[in-house]
Amino acid sequence: MRTVWTICLILFIVIIGFFGDLIWYGVQQGIGQAKIIYRAEEVSDVLSNANTPDSVKLKLNFIQQVRAYAQDSLGLNDSKNYTSFFDQEGKDLMWVVQACPEFSLEAYTWNYGFLGRLPYRGYFDSLRSAKLSKQLWDEGYDVDVSPVQAWSTLGWFRDPILSNMLDEDEGMLARLVIHELT
């Protein structure tokens, strides 16, 4: 039995050694997403709240119409995404870092294990995104750090409507919602 525990400990140390940064990044992302998902309110509750401005109610109803269109006319699955609402109180929630070599359009990519390589890295902490941006800049990359309006948990969780999404006109809002539902 002692041999089994020793092998497990060695495997654990090796996995942390090779994938520790990726695991820590995943934990940070999970915490950021969980805070938002946990604090989100049901759209039906927001719509029935007398204190909700009419402009917010109109956009929330529009998003529900876009969801129905995406399911009925485009054949997308009913994922229950965008059936809850998170008020950002005017603050950005997430920042995406993108980079490429100077004078190049070839994107720098990050390895996300079983998800593959992606040309961006997102953070729920602006200081972490700024730190990575500076590191890449110091390595000679052109870097862009941008706040994002929405993101997808790829069906793992029920993604909420973020209040800053409501700043978009109907055309852009429909595009954003359909994009995130696919």
Please state what every model-predicted region is.
Residues 1-91:
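N-terminal low-structure segments adjacent to metalloprotease catalytic domains
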Residues 65-182:
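Acidic/His-rich structured neighborhood in mature extracellular/periplasmic domains
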